[in-house]
C-alpha cells in the first residue's frame, strides 16, 4: 500500500512538465494544493465482512469487495455485502434522475423492465437477480426493476430520455451537461519510461454520484476472466470505466460529448461493457463484444491496452459509426472529444474548433503534457497529470471544467455548463503493464489534486443546488493507494 506524495514531490514533478515557462512554474508552485491528509486509520477496517466466498473491507476511502462463484453467487455476495451502500446510492440516483428528467421513478422502472431486461444475457440476469436476493437477505427492500434501472444510471436518463424527448418534440437537456465526463490517456513504446503501457483515468461525474463511486471490485467469475475494477454500488460493470483483466487487457474510456442517439431494440451498454471486460482476450475481442447489439447508450471512446503485445487502441463506439485506431508506439488521450469525422457529423453536436469548450481545452492539455514528456511517462507522472489545473483557453492556473482535474463547482463561464455545478473529477486511477500482470492498480478517492469538497459550505454559497442537500455529502480526497487482486484486510500496526 502506498500513500500520497509530499507537496515538494508534486512540485518537483511539475517541473518536468513541458511547455511551461519559469514564471508559470512559480505560479504552479504557489497554486499547488497541499495533499489531503491520509484517511484516519479509523476509516480503515481491520476485520472483513464475509458472505460465502465474498468479503469486503474499507481502506483509504475505498471499499474493497471480493466476489467469487456462479453468476447468482456473485450477485448475492454483491447485494449482501454492499446493502447499505446500494440503498444509499439508489436514493441519490433516484433523486438525480427524476429531478433532471422531469420523469417519475416508475418511468425508469418500466424502461428497465420492458426495454432493457429482455435483452440482458441470462448470465447477467442471474447476477442481477442475485444482487436483489442478497439485498433482501440483508433487509434492503429494492426489487429487480430498481436494480436494473440503477445499473443503467448512465444510459437511461442521459441517452434514452433525450432520445425519447426528441421523438415526442419535448425540450431536450443540454448534451454538454450530461456527457462531458472523464479525462484519460494510454501510452506505450518509446513514449513511456520503461516502454510499458501506462494508463490513467479520472472519473468525472456529479459529486452526488462521485462521493459514492468508491468500490474496488475483485471478481472471480465461474467463466471468463478475473477482473479488478473500480465501481459503483449495485452495478455489475465498472461504468466509469477502469479495469484490468486476467486476459491481459487494460481498459478505460471517456464519454463522447454532445452525443445523441439511442436504439430501443439494442442491448444495454452496462451489459456489453461487463461482458467485454469478462470475456475479451484481445482488442479485437473487446470491439466485437461492444458492437454486438449496440444500443447507443453511454457512447464512449474506449482506450484499451493489451499488455501481452504492448499494443494500445482507441475505439470510438458511436451508434451509427465506429472506428478503431491502434499503435505499439504512441499514445491516445480522452477528454470527451470524438475523432471520427463521421461520428462528429452524424451523431454529435460537437465543435472541434472551439478552444473554449471543456473537451477541447483538455485535449490540448493532454497533447502538451504527453508530447512534452515523451520517454518519461510513468505512473508517477500520470498521477501528476490527473491533478493538473492549467486552463489552456485562459492560459492560467485555476481548477474549473476545462482543466484535467475538473472542478465544476469552481466554474462559472465554461460554455454549455451550468455555473458552479457540483460535478468534476471524483477519483483517479493509474497502472502500467507490470502492475496489470498482477491485476494491480493505484487509486485515489476524490479530486486527484487533493482538494476536498465541503458540501455544507457549497450549499450555503450556492442555494440553487439545495435540491441536492438530502444526498450531497463532503467528498474528501484520499491518498494514492495500491490495490491488487486477492487482497485481504490490513492488520493494525503493533
Regions of interest found by a model, annotated:
Residues 25-284, 291-297, 303-326, 355-494:
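N-terminal mature-domain region immediately after signal-peptide cleavage
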Residues 311-353:
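Extended amphipathic alpha-helical segments with heptad-repeat/coiled-coil character used for oligomerization
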Residues 7-19:
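Bacterial N-terminal signal peptides
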Residues 1-6:
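Positively charged n-region of N-terminal signal peptides that target proteins for export
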Amino acid at each position: 500500500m502506498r500513500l500520497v506524495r509530499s507537496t515538494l514531490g508534486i512540485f518537483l514533478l511539475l517541473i518536468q512538465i513541458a511547455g511551461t515557462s519559469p514564471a508559470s512554474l512559480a505560479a504552479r508552485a504557489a497554486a499547488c494544493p497541499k495533499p489531503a491528509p491520509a484517511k484516519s486509520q479509523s476509516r480503515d477496517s481491520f476485520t472483513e465482512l464475509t458472505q460465502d466466498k465474498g468479503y469486503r473491507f474499507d481502506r483509504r476511502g475505498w471499499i474493497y469487495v471480493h466476489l467469487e462463484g456462479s453468476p447468482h453467487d456473485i450477485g448475492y455476495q454483491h447485494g449482501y455485502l454492499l446493502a447499505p451502500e446500494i440503498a444509499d446510492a439508489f436514493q441519490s440516483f433516484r433523486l438525480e434522475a427524476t429531478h433532471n428528467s422531469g420523469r417519475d421513478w416508475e418511468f425508469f422502472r418500466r424502461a428497465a423492465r420492458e426495454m432493457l431486461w429482455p435483452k440482458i444475457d441470462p448470465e447477467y440476469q442471474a447476477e442481477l437477480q442475485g444482487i436483489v436476493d442478497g439485498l433482501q437477505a440483508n433487509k434492503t427492500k429494492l426489487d429487480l426493476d430498481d436494480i436494473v434501472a440503477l445499473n443503467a444510471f448512465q444510459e437511461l436518463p442521459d441517452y434514452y430520455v433525450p432520445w425519447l424527448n426528441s421523438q415526442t418534440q419535448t425540450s431536450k437537456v443540454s448534451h454538454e451537461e450530461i456527457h462531458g465526463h472523464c479525462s484519460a490517456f494510454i501510452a506505450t513504446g518509446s513514449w513511456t519510461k520503461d516502454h510499458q503501457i501506462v494508463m490513467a483515468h479520472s472519473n468525472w461525474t456529479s459529486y452526488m454520484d462521485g462521493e459514492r463511486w468508491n468500490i474496488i471490485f475483485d471478481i472471480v467469475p465461474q467463466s471468463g476472466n478475473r477482473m479488478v475494477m473500480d465501481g459503483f454500488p449495485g452495478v455489475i460493470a465498472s461504468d466509469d470505466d477502469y479495469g484490468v483483466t486476467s486476459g491481459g487487457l487494460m481498459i478505460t474510456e471517456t464519454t463522447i460529448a454532445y452525443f445523441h442517439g439511442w436504439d430501443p431494440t439494442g442491448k444495454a451498454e452496462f451489459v456489453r461493457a461487463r461482458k467485454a471486460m469478462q470475456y475479451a482476450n484481445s482488442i479485437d475481442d473487446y470491439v466485437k463484444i461492444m458492437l454486438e447489439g449496440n444500443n447507443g447508450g453511454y457512447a464512449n471512446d474506449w482506450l484499451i491496452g493489451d499488455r501481452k503485445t504492448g499494443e494500445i487502441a482507441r475505439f470510438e463506439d458511436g451508434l451509427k459509426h465506429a472506428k478503431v485506431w491502434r499503435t505499439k508506439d504512441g499514445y491516445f488521450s480522452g477528454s470527451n472529444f470524438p475523432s471520427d469525422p463521421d461520428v462528429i457529423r452524424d451523431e454529435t453536436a460537437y465543435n472541434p474548433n472551439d478552444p473554449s469548450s471543456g473537451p477541447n481545452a483538455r485535449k490540448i492539455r493532454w497533447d502538451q503534457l504527453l508530447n512534452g514528456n515523451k520517454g518519461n511517462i510513468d505512473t508517477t507522472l500520470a498521477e501528476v497529470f490527473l491533478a493538473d489545473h492549467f486552463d489552456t483557453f485562459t492560459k492560467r492556473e485555476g481548477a474549473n471544467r476545462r482543466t484535467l482535474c475538473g472542478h465544476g463547482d469552481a466554474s462559472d463561464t465554461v460554455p454549455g455548463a451550468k455555473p458552479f455545478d457540483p460535478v468534476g473529477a471524483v477519483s483517479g486511477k493509474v497502472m502500467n503493464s507490470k502492475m496489470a500482470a498482477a491485476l494491480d492498480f493505484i487509486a485515489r478517492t476524490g479530486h486527484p489534486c487533493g482538494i476536498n469538497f465541503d458540501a455544507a459550505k457549497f450549499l450555503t454559497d450556492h442555494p440553487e443546488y439545495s435540491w441536492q442537500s438530502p444526498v450531497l455529502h463532503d467528498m474528501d480526497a484520499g491518498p494514492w493507494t495500491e490495490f491488487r487482486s486477492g487482497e485481504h484486510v490490513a492488520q493494525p500496526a503493533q
